[in-house]
Design a protein with these regions (language model features):
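Conserved serine/cysteine hydrolase catalytic core
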Residues: 167-225, 230-233
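Short beta-to-alpha linker loops that shape the active-site pocket of alpha/beta-hydrolase fold enzymes
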Residues: 46-51, 110, 237-238
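Active-site loop/oxyanion-hole signature of alpha/beta-hydrolase fold enzymes
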Residues: 2, 34, 43-81, 89, ...
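Conserved alpha/beta-hydrolase "nucleophile elbow" surrounding the catalytic nucleophile
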Residues: 20-22, 82-87
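Catalytic histidine-centered segment of alpha/beta-hydrolase-like enzymes
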Residues: 237-246, 250
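Conserved HGGG/HGGXW glycine-rich cap/lid loop of the alpha/beta-hydrolase fold
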Residues: 5-54
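Flexible "cap/lid" loop of the alpha/beta hydrolase fold
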Residues: 92-95, 100-137
Length: 259
């Protein structure tokens, strides 16, 4: 049994597993998950290094993927929904363990190497430089991040990881490793995948109109690994498509699931 922390919603119907992005946690999907739970069994996963799941010494996509695979069974293949980093994990799960994945949904991520991860490094540095011993209220932590992270929505997202631990605060994610291994998080393990075939199941790609993570430049790689994919661009959305346009995201997901 996998040691990953999960939240389970719903009691009947096909199973849908949600994988969050960098600095996220399973509960980021809580609102969407509850809405789907009327017709599906929903699993919200804390990926390694995040939330209440284990925090290994290094970040490795295939190890993360293997940990998610331990949650699943070939007798009950699932729809996997992954955003950003979780999108890469979802793609790798479909490629390396296709018997576990009935359908795949990728939210604003492509099967490519991303060279520019500087923005995420800024977030890591800001969180690590925050003196949590001097923080008594969450509002003080928010103020401490404001200069480095001026976007209030992003700050709110990051601060969801701030947890009370007795009389003090701590970050509920593996900041030292995530900060050090950002290049690996931007990577795509092409060499390790040479022994695998393309995933031949149905794939829905949900791209943010204002994001540059899914572009025409990446279409050949998407087609190579996922020949049955269909791309939907969500108007007005940036990278966090599911939180910026939740109703549109949910409608596209329900249609794909056949609800």
């Amino acid at each position: 049994m996998s040691s990953l922390h999960t939240i389970e919603l719903g009691e009947t119907g096909s199973r849908v597993v949600f994988l969050h992005g960098l600095f996220g946690q399973g509960r980021n999907w809580n609102t969407l998950g509850k809405q789907l739970a009327d017709k599906h069994r929903v699993t919200l996963v804390d990926l390694p290094h995040h939330g209440r799941s284990p925090q290994p010494d290094t970040f490795d996509y295939l190890e993360v993927t293997a940990a998610v695979a331990e949650l699943l069974s070939a007798e009950d293949p699932v729809t996997v929904v992954g955003h950003s980093m979780g999108g890469k994990v979802a793609m790798l799960l479909a490629i390396t363990r296709p018997e576990l994945v009935a359908k795949l949904v990728v939210a604003d991520m492509s099967p490519v190497v991303y060279e520019r991860v500087g923005g995420f490094k800024t977030y890591v540095d800001a969180m690590q430089s925050l003196d949590l011993d001097s923080v008594s209220r969450r509002e003080e932590a928010d103020a401490g991040l404001q200069e480095a992270v001026p976007d209030q929505t992003v700050r709110g997202f990051l601060l969801q990881n701030l947890r009370r631990d007795g009389d003090s605060w701590r970050w509920a994610m593996n900041l030292p490793v995530l900060g050090r291994d950002l290049d690996q998080i931007g990577d795509w393990p092409a060499d390790e995948l040479k022994a695998y075939e393309a995933y031949d199941g149905p794939v829905l790609w949900l791209a943010g109109e204002r994001s540059n993570y899914v572009t025409d430049e990446y279409a050949p790689a998407m087609k190579e690994w996922f020949p049955r994919y269909r791309k939907v661009t969500i108007k007005g959305a940036g990278h966090w498509v599911h939180s910026e346009k939740p109703e549109t995201f949910l409608a596209a997901l329900r249609q794909f699931l056949g609800d």
